[in-house]
Amino acid sequence: MSLKQGNPTMKEVATEAGVSLGTVSKVINNIPVGEEYRKKVEDAARKLGYQVNNYARSLRTNKTNTIALIIPNLSHPYFGAIANAIAVALNRRGYSMLTSISNSDDEGEQRCLSLAMEHKVDGVIAMTYNPRLEVGPQLNFVTIDRFINSSVPCVSCDNFGGGQMAAEKLMELGCKRLMFMRSGTHIYGEPDKRIAGFEMACKMHGIPYDTLNLHESEGLAPFEAYLDAHIKEGKADFDGLFCNTDRLAMVMAGQIRLRGCRVPEDVQIIGFDGIRDFISGGYLCSTIVQPVELIAETAVSSLFPQDSSDIKPLIALPVSYAFGGTTKG
């Protein structure tokens, strides 16, 4: 006797369950039927090993229950945390996630978007750095941290408020001369408001400050040169440092210690993101914490608003300060 190959058909499921083909179709497509009929179909499908052909169903319903996430990379802890939180938020709604890595490249982002559209996804969430990204008007599209235009919802944290919070926390902890360091892309995004909030707080309180704003491609050398010029014989001419990311804050803490300064006794440092240590669960450094889960939940909700009047072009979610050992409190 030969075994039948391939996935059983809906007709075979209907025969096994003793119901009509239409009833099987309703159960598979989540259309309400009597509980008795639903159980018969589910039991028959399980017995026969029937698997839903999602591609065929998407052709009928014009819906794939898949959302694409376009993200620069997964090596940065914040990007990894956001990707995980979005996957959780989508899973709660019965959606799968197609992840595409753009490497912060304009052409790469456009390819990622084209790939997502080829897969007939129901929407796209993107952390994009491409000012010329071509987005079709019919595509459900939400960005994180980069405002494109008023028709595309952008979800971010309160970056301006976070910069202000960091400066004022350093002042509260006794710092008298502050420094801001940034490493990032050349494309303006919501995170660039951190320096504006920092500068406003310094000016408002009459605190002297300096800034070093660099492109990530420049590497560590310009930061090292700055520290060499401003730390002499173990004494720095600044006592409070705010970095635009936790990762940069940790690198600078190491570089400052190499030059004979103590952290936090001589120089207090605050980062931004709220990245936790994988083993201990504590914060890597004192930091302005982004509400990662709330950002993810808001981005997913913004893809499918119940009322179009609820769509906001820019949503800035609140941040908070957390101690992580690189400040005195």
Residue ranges and their predicted role:
Residues 1-5, 9, 69-168, 172, ...:
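Alpha-helical recognition/docking segments in bacterial nutrient-uptake
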Residues 40, 78-92, 162-165, 189-208, ...:
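Short, solvent-exposed amphipathic alpha-helices that sit
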Residues 90-101, 199-222:
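Short beta-strand elements in bilobed, periplasmic/extracellular small-molecule ligand-binding domains
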Residues 21-25, 59-73, 177-184:
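Short beta-strand segments enriched in small/hydrophobic residues
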Residues 153-180, 220-229, 249, 289-308:
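Hydrophobic alpha-helical segments within soluble ligand-binding/sensing domains
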Residues 166-209, 311-328:
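An alpha-beta-alpha
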Residues 228-329:
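Flexible loop/turn connectors
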Residues 1-64, 328:
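N-terminal helix-turn-helix DNA-binding module of bacterial transcription factors
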